[in-house]
């Protein structure tokens, strides 16, 4: 109550901040008349003046009013567009490192020019992040005219561009690209073998367009660079053949072999189903006759393949979750409806779907490098974003990214009418109503945009409209090359456009059609009279569409997130234009069936409804929104859970990547190598000659043999120590260190100091990369089973952190040993031979990167996805056994003395076995 009273008195936080920014808007406006008097040359010279001021210590905040005023005046002269006051506010919000929520049609692309120009003056690079390559190239070309006029360089990065071009793009003051490309290049840079091979010059400032799509919707999709593994794909094909012989249950209690939990997106084998699957697998020769259980240790790979095949058949539908094109399974983005060429699901799911569809099955991939978007964008020193719908996710932006959301007022009041949802008993009644609404709009000359959740529905609607002879366009993943043309014409009188989800996002639908597109189609020799005639015709169309009610939005299904529904609605009513929206729902829709059907069915029964009847009630809409809020909260928990686990990986990633950067930047790492060598030798000697031990416990022959096999060093220790009294472990360590140092000095003298320095760097980088790659695979295995610790009354997250730390420490120790051993074994005779080795390694990395793929990993696991499913499918006896794991002796630490009494550390004795 007190809060609401204070808000009424002083305004909300958003309103108070807007008032503060309005005072700066007044300063910018006061400079406008003066700047308009300047010549082009004088205005362009302001950029050089600003750069000098920054070098002299002036802050960007102090420069902001004048820099924004200069950018606005330049935009007016070059682009013919002058920033409104609300756009100036949006620009300031972005500069302050916040998220600007701006409605569709408010000119977000133009708003971004203000903070981009200001921050690019610092010379550290600004990244403008878009959702697809088309928008990146379009905006770079269009806004590049303004930046170039002001003396700033612009680059754009996209997949497959030449190495030198990408270097130049990142060297520009402003770089446009997609979130995927910036992320991939960050990972590639951390696989580079020299400074010259790196693209990026640090992550300084990023403006993320459609920030909700990238930082929320895609936050469960880690970027993964992966290479093909060695396993044969044949097992996927053989396992796929048995799935049609298994029967799906209606629910958990019904008869059958497996049931599908749509809410949790899981598939469960019943007890009967497990026995049936075992029989079928034996008949197919996949399980041997003697195998007593599918879940025996030797059959874990078969379980992995069976789980993947069940999910492929039961949860993933063709033309909804993926399409088959040119003999390949291509993922369809659930949020945008676009195809994600090059992306692959992980954990064998993509291969299982390929086997299901009868296309060539590609090998599974091994992770080489990975990062989540959450951790990628948190690396930037300053981050901001803009979107039409962020306020519903304000808490997540603040808690995960530290980004505050500010709602920017519209330039003109919004007059769009949002009609209540219409709810039907079944899908056929719903789609009949949708078709009638479309036909009514087309008849009255009102353009209509129909939003669907899948390609399948968009094509079904298209077929019905074709039969009814209603002219229309379909915009989905299959037509994505024509996207810009379809969107440009979607505002024409009576135009009917069916769009999958939010395809076409980023391009405004202009009432009457796009004037720019029509003008661009004119002959280059067209006269002013021709242009005037085209503009007059467009004005007539524009007014006719406004009179018909503007753009009408039809939603054929509610999405899991209110934000995506709002994005669809937001396509209408841009810049004060008229418009309307309505959602048509049925009890058979996914969201209604899973989350809201029971309550609504109860209401429908009480009202005596039958097929074809409709409910149109605000209370139903509120109930649906309540269900959506539950789903949003659930999805947030999943993303937060992912981040908690990935933060562990991220700390390790930062250590490894910082080490790589030091290696690449250093002229010489001789001191590091010497230090590591002494450390490794100490550990080696301690392994065979433990400290404070008696000579009966020493293993001098073993130490001699190891020095010979791993180092190529013949050191007759036994002979050297014969007849000596008072010999202890410390003396032996000194003798070995001295011999190894002399051996290394001789090697360096034989090949030259410069070649040795290059060899040290090369070996250190190669071994570190290999160790990190193997560590990532180990961490994947740890993650997949960590939730089982809960059955032993332990906290999975704490266990994950503890074991991850131990694994990482062991990996670093292994890298040290391997570096020293490799340097001792490698035979290099000349500088030319060293250069050839480096070039060969570089070619291998290039080949690996060309073969690498972006896996669309479903990261909802860590005990909430496949891992939990595999446990639930196990026989009850096995589950109970897991729950009763109790340690009856104290755990032995890796560095504690081994309980066997050898005197060695546990990790060097029986710890090696475990």
UniProtKB/Swiss-Prot annotation:
Reactions catalysed according to its record: ATP + H2O + cellular proteinSide 1 = ADP + phosphate + cellular proteinSide 2
Name the major location: membrane
**How does the protein associate with the membrane?**
Peripheral membrane protein
Q: What class of enzyme is it?
A: translocase
- Residues annotated to bind ATP: 87, 105-109, 508
Query: What is the top-level taxon of the source organism?
Result: Bacteria
Enzyme Commission number(s) from the entry: 7.4.2.8
**Cofactor(s) the protein requires to work:** Zn(2+)
Q: Which SUPFAM superfamilies match?
A: Helical scaffold and wing domains of SecA (SSF81886), P-loop containing nucleoside triphosphate hydrolases (SSF52540), Pre-protein crosslinking domain of SecA (SSF81767)
Output the Gene Ontology cellular-component terms: cell envelope Sec protein transport complex; cytosol; plasma membrane
Cite the GO molecular-function annotations of the record. ATP binding; metal ion binding; protein-exporting ATPase activity
Q: Which CDD domains match?
A: DEXDc_SecA, SF2_C_secA
Free-text remark on how the cofactor is bound: May bind 1 zinc ion per subunit.
Listed A to Z, the keywords are: ATP-binding, Cell inner membrane, Cell membrane, Cytoplasm, Membrane, Metal-binding, Nucleotide-binding, Protein transport, Translocase, Translocation, Transport, Zinc
Which compartments is it annotated to reside in? Cell inner membrane; Cytoplasm
- Residues engaged in binding Zn(2+): 898, 900, 909-910
Per its database record, what is this protein's job? Part of the Sec protein translocase complex. Interacts with the SecYEG preprotein conducting channel. Has a central role in coupling the hydrolysis of ATP to the transfer of proteins into and across the cell membrane, serving both as a receptor for the preprotein-SecB complex and as an ATP-driven molecular motor driving the stepwise translocation of polypeptide chains across the membrane.
User: What does the subunit comment say?
Assistant: Monomer and homodimer. Part of the essential Sec protein translocation apparatus which comprises SecA, SecYEG and auxiliary proteins SecDF-YajC and YidC.
Q: Which family would the database say this protein is a member of? A: Belongs to the SecA family.
The protein's matches in HAMAP family, at most eight in alphabetical order, are given as:
SecA
According to UniProt, the name of this protein is Protein translocase subunit SecA
């Amino acid at each position: 109550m007190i809060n609401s009273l204070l808000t009424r008195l002083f305004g909300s936080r958003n309103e108070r901040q807007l008032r503060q920014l309005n005072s700066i808007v007044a300063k910018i406006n006061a400079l406008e008349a003066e700047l308009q008097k300047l010549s082009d040359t004088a205005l362009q010279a302001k950029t050089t003046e600003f750069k000098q001021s920054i070098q002299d210590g002036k802050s960007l905040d102090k420069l902001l009013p004048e820099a924004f005023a200069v950018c606005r005046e330049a935009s007016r002269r070059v682009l013919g567009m002058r920033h409104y006051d609300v756009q100036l506010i949006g620009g300031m919000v972005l500069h302050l490192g916040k998220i600007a929520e701006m409605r569709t049609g408010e000119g977000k692309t133009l708003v971004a020019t203000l903070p981009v120009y200001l921050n690019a003056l610092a010379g550290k690079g600004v990244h403008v992040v878009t959702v697809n390559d088309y928008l990146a190239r379009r905006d770079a070309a269009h806004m590049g005219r303004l930046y170039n006029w002001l003396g700033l360089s612009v680059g754009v990065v996209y997949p497959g561009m030449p190495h030198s071009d990408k270097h130049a793009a990142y060297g520009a003051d402003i770089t446009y690209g997609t979130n995927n490309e910036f992320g991939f290049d960050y990972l590639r840079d951390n696989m580079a073998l020299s400074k010259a091979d790196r693209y990026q010059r640090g992550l300084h400032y990023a403006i993320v367009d459609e920030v909700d799509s990238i930082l929320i919707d895609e936050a469960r999709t880690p970027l993964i660079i992966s290479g093909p593994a060695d396993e044969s794909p044949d097992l996927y094909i053989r396992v796929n053949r048995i799935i049609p012989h298994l029967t799906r249950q209606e629910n958990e209690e019904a008869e059958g072999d497996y049931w599908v939990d749509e809410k949790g997106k899981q598939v469960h084998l019943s007890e009967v189903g497990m026995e049936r699957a075992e029989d079928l697998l034996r008949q197919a020769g996949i399980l041997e006759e003697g195998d007593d259980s599918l879940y025996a240790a030797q059959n874990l790979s078969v379980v992995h393949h069976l789980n993947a095949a069940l999910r492929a058949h039961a949860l993933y539908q063709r033309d909804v979750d993926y399409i088959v094109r040119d003999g390949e399974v291509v993922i369809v983005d659930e949020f945008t409806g676009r195809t994600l060429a090059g992306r692959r699901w992980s954990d064998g799911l993509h291969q299982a779907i390929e086997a299901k569809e009868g296309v060539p099955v590609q090998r599974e991939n091994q992770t080489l490098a990975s990062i989540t978007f959450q951790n990628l964008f948190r690396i930037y020193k300053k981050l901001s974003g803009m979107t039409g719908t962020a306020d519903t996710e304000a808490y997540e932006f603040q808690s995960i990214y530290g980004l505050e959301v500010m709602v920017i007022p519209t330039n003109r009041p919004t007059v769009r009418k949002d009609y209540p949802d219409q709810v039907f008993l079944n899908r056929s009644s719903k789609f009949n109503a949708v078709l009638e609404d479309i036909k009514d709009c087309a008849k009255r000359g009102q353009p209509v945009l129909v939003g669907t959740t899948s390609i399948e529905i968009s094509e079904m609607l298209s077929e019905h409209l074709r039969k009814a002879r209603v002219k229309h366009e379909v915009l989905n993943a299959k037509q994505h090359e024509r996207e810009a043309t379809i969107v440009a014409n979607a505002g024409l009188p009576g135009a009917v456009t069916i769009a999958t989800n939010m395809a076409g996002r980023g391009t405004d639908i202009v009432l009457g059609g796009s004037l720019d597109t029509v003008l661009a189609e004119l002959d280059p020799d067209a006269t002013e009279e021709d242009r005037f005639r085209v503009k007059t015709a467009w004005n007539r169309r524009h007014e006719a569409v406004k009179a018909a009610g503007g753009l009408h939005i039809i939603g054929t299904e509610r999405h899991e997130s209110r934000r995506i529904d709002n994005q669809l609605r937001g396509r209408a009513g841009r810049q004060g234009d008229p418009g309307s929206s309505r959602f048509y729902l049925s009890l058979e829709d996914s969201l209604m069936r899973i989350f809201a059907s029971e309550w609504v069915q109860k209401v429908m029964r009480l009202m005596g409804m039958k097929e074809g009847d409709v409910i149109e009630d605000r209370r139903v809409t509120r109930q649906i929104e309540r269900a959506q809020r539950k789903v949003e909260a659930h999805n947030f928990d999943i993303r937060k859970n992912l981040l908690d686990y990935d933060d562990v990986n991220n700390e390790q990633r930062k250590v490894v990547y910082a080490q790589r950067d030091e290696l690449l930047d250093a002229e010489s790492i001789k001191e590091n190598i010497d230090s590591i060598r002494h450390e490794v030798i100490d550990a080696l000697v301690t392994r065979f000659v433990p400290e404070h031990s008696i000579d009966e416990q020493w293993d001098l022959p073993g130490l001699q043999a190891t020095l010979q096999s791993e180092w190529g060093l013949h050191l007759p220790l036994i002979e050297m120590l014969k007849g000596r009294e008072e010999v202890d472990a410390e003396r032996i360590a000194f003798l070995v260190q001295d011999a190894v140092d002399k051996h290394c000095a001789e090697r360096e003298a034989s090949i030259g100091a410069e070649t040795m320095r290059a060899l040290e760097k090369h070996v250190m980088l190669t071994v570190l990369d290999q160790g990190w790659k193997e560590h990532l695979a180990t961490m994947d295995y740890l993650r997949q089973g960590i939730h089982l610790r809960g059955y032993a009354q332990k906290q999975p997250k704490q266990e994950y952190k503890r074991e991850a730390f131990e694994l990482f420490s062991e990996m670093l120790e292994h890298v040290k040993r391997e570096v020293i051993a490799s340097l001792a074994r490698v035979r290099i005779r000349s500088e030319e031979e060293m250069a050839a080795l480096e070039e060969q390694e570089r070619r291998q990395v290039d080949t690996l990167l060309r073969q690498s793929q972006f896996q669309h990993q479903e990261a909802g696991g860590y005990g909430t996805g496949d891992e939990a499913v595999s446990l639930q499918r196990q026989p009850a006896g096995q589950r109970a056994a897991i729950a009763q794991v109790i340690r009856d002796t104290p755990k032995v630490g890796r560095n504690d003395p081994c309980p066997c009494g050898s005197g060695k550390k546990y990790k060097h004795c029986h710890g090696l076995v475990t």
